[in-house]
């Protein structure tokens, strides 16, 4: 089962289940405060010296089957080359979790995403399925991660996909979306149009 959720709902669930063993994987320096175990490919043991931190060095995650009550994977899957194996691993080590991903728009807007992200996502609300395709850069990126975080406070549902899963993460690979089928949107062209419109407005 895969469905839309919000991080606020997840936080409320954690408050009601204080005894859960929770894994936050691939979180970098921003681990969830309720995480019992933190895991990342970077060695962040000094940063998380008072936490249970485990560095990931192998493709297969270093955890037992169903070891966790809940697993958080926030802004991780878009970076993983073999995302199908990673999803199977999430399903193996827990029976439920929270996934946060950039929307296709959110992905394209941010400078840092241009070379770091491999996959593109949208959620099919009818089939309750995550649709995955190879990333396409259709807009010249023009904002930083920090600016994107500010935008998310107001436009979160447009920039971020938040999903809760139980037992299985349903997804489908869709290779129909190809960059060559679309005309790339130039930021500078948009900016010129904006300036032109602004100038005409001023001198009306």
Please identify what each model-predicted range represents.
Residues 1-9:
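Conserved SAM-binding loop and adjacent beta-strand
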Residues 6, 50, 60, 65-67, ...:
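Generic intrinsically disordered, low-complexity segments enriched for polar/acidic and small residues
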Residues 84-92, 96-204:
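S-adenosyl-L-methionine-dependent methyltransferase catalytic module, highlighting the catalytic core
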Residues 9, 13-106:
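Conserved SAM-binding loop
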């Amino acid at each position: 089962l895969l469905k839309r959720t919000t991080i606020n709902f997840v936080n409320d669930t954690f408050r009601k289940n204080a005894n859960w063993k929770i894994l936050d994987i691939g979180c970098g320096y921003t681990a969830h405060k309720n995480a019992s175990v933190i895991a990342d490919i970077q060695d962040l043991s000094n940063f998380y010296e008072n936490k249970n931190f485990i560095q990931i060095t192998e493709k297969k995650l270093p955890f037992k089957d169903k070891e966790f009550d809940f697993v958080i994977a926030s802004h991780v899957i878009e970076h993983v080359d073999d995302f199908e194996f990673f999803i199977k691993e999430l399903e193996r080590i827990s029976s439920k979790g929270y996934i946060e991903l950039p929307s296709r728009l959110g992905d394209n807007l941010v400078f840092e995403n241009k070379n770091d992200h491999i996959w593109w996502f949208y959620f099919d609300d009818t089939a309750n399925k995550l649709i995955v395709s190879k990333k396409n850069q259709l807009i010249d990126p023009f904002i930083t991660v920090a600016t994107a975080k500010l935008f998310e406070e107001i436009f979160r549902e447009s920039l971020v996909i938040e999903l809760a899963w139980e037992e299985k993460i349903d997804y489908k690979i869709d290779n129909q979306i190809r960059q060559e089928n679309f005309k790339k949107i130039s930021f500078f062209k948009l900016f010129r149009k904006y300036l032109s419109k602004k100038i005409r407005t001023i001198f009306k």
